[in-house]
C-alpha cells in the first residue's frame, strides 16, 4: 500500500535533511568557507580538513575576498608568505594563492587569467620563481571552478569532514596544520629540520624526481612566464617575480648538475622583461647552519615564515630591523651574472665547511647513476 | 548521460516524467510512447550524437527484417534465412565496433603482418542493444511477437532505463505493458519507482564508488609494476568484488525503478548473487537476463544437455567463453569466461555424484560454507575480469598468495588487523579516515591499502554484512511488484508493507547522501616537492 501523501512526505523529508545538512556543515565549517562563520573552541576552531585542497579552495576564496594583491607560486610561497605581513601597505589586502605540488609557469598563467575574472580588485601579482618546478601541470577551467566550489558546500566529503572536524576539536584539540584564512599554510608541529636536511640526498637522487641529473632550459616553461607578463601588461597589473631564498645545500645540487647556466639564462631574460627581486644572496639568514632548531628554514627547500615576513616587508618598503644588508636585490640583466657568481662562491665555501653532508650527497648520487646505468 | 549524474537526475528525468504525465492524459498511445522514444534518443545521443545515426540505422534495418519475418508471408525456410541474415547483420555491427581492434591486434601479433590496429570508438550500450535485437528477431521467427509497429519496436529497443546496460528484455515482456501502463496510477508508480531508483543510486554512488577508489589504486599499483603485500592485494580484490556487485546491483535497481516510474516492469536482473551456494546458483542470480539470453539463444541451439554429458559440458564451455568475450575484447575476459565455464562444469559434475545429495550437504553450516567457497571463487575470477592484461592478473594472483614469512606475506595481515581494527590509535583517528586523493602517489608503499587507507577494514566488514545478511531490493519492495520474474514468495512477503512517511524519511536521506556523493572534495597528494 502506498500512502497518498508519500511523495509529499518524500519532498518534505528531503527538505528537512537538506536543512539539517546545511545547518550542520555551515556551523562546523570544515573548510572555512561558510557564509555564517561561527567559531567555537573544542567544536570547530581548528580545521584539520582545510589542508591539501588549495586548488579547490583558493579560486573560491580569491572570488570571495577580492584581494588587491595575490601571490602565485609553489609550496615555498604557500608555506612562508603570510599576507597579513603586508597589512597597512599599498599591497593590502593580500591573499596567498600559491598552489603547492607541481605548480608550473603555465599553470600560474592560467590561474592568473581566472583570478582576473574572479577578482575585480586585483592590482598586483607576486610570482615566486622556483627553477626545478618549471614543468607542465593541470590548468584550471571554469567548469573546475564551479564544480570545486559546489563540492566545498554540497558534497558527502563536506558532511564527513564536518564530523571529522567536530571529533578532532572535541577529542584532541591540539593545533594542527591547515591553510590559514589568508591562504598560506601553517604547520604548528614542524619536524626537526636537521633530519629533513639529511634526507635531501636520498630524496633528490630517487625515482621521485624526474631526471635529477639534468638541467636544461625549458622553453615551454619560459613561455609560461612570458604569458604571465603579457597578461599583467594587458590588464595593467603590477607584476613582481620573486627568487626565493635558496639554501646552500640545494645550491650545491644545482652546482653539481651544472644548472647555473640555465639559471643565469632564465634570470637574464626575465629581468629584461619584468621586475625581478632575488632573496637568494648568501647571508646569515639564507646560509643558516643546519641544526634541529632553525629559525629561517623548515627543510632544504622551504624557508620559514620568519624569512617570508622579512621578504614581504622588504618588498613593501616597510620598516625592518635585523635583516642582512643584501637580503633583497633587484635583478637586472647586467647584475645576474655577479649575483650567481656570489652564490657559486658561497656554495663552494659551504661544501668545504660541511664535508659529511657533501659525502652523503655524493654517495646517493653515485648510487643513482649506477642504477641508471644498469637499467639502461 | 549517466543515471548517476546531476543532469540526468535534476534535468532529464523531471522533464521526461512531466512530459509523459501530460501526454498520457489523452487517449492516443502514440504521444506518450513517442515522447519516451524521443527522450530515449536524446539520452542516447548525449554522449556522442553521431552514434544516434548508427542506432537509427540499425533500428530501421532490424525493423525491415522483422517486417519481412512477421508480415512477409514467408515460408519457414525463407523466414529462417532472413533471421540468419538479420543475426549476421547485428553481429557484424557488434564485431566491427567491439572486436575489430582485438582481432587485428591478435592476427598481427601471430603473423607479424605489421597491420595498423584500428582505433574504433565503441558505441555505448552496443553489446546490450545487439542482443536485444537478436532476441527480437528470433522471437519473431518463433511467432512470439505481437503489436509490431515501428514506434513500438523503436520503444522496445531504445527505452532509456534499459538501453545502455540492460536488462536484456524480450519483446513479449515489454509490448503487453504499453497499453496497461497508460491506465496505471502514475503517482503510485512514481512513488515505488523513485524509491527503488534511490536505493540503486545509493548503492552505486555511496557504496560502489567509495570502494572503487581503493580497488583502482591497487590495480594501478600492479599495472605500474610495483608490489603489493598480501593484505593489500586482498583489500584490492575484495574492494573490486564488492564494487562490481554494488555497481551492477545499483544500476539494475535504478533501471527497474526508472521503468516503474513510467508504469513499466523490467525483468529482474540481479538477485543477491553473492548469497549463491554454487556457481550454477550464481549465474541464476547475476546478470539474469544475460544468462537467459545465452541459455535460450546459444546453449539450447548448440544442443544444450540433449546430447550427453560431455557434449553438455562442451556447450557450457563454449557459451561461457563467448559470454566472457561479450564482456570485453580482451583475452582476460575470454579466460574469465572459460574459468566460469570450467567452474560450472565442475559444479554440474559434482551435482551428478550421489554423495552431493547426502544430508551432510543440506545443513545450514554446509550452505554457509558453500556461500563462502562460491564467493571466494567468484572474487578470484574477478581478478581476470578487472586486470588489463594477463600479466597484471598473474602478478595480482601472486601477491594474493600469502605463504611467505617475509613482511609481504602472512605478517602483512597483522599490520592490517592492527591498524584497521585492534589498535584504536589508528583505527579511530577520524581525521585520517577516508582520504581518497585526487592523485595517488606515483608509487604506493606495498602495505598502503591495508594499513594507511583507514577505515578500509571496517568498510569491507560493513559491506560484507550488508551483502550477506541483508535482504535485497526486491525482498524489501516485493509487495509492490517491482520487477518481472521474481519468485512468488518475494512478491508476497516483501518487508515493506506500505510506503509511508517513515520510509520517505529513509529514502530522502539516502537520496541526499547519494546526491552529495556525486560531488567530491579531492585532496591533492603532494608527492613531489
Language-model features, listed with the residues they occupy:
Chain A
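Short extracytoplasmic
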Residues: 44-71
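Hydrophobic membrane-insertion alpha-helices, especially the h-region
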Residues: 8-29
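Membrane-embedded segments
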Residues: 66-156
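Alpha-helical transmembrane signal-anchor/signal-peptide segments
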Residues: 28-53
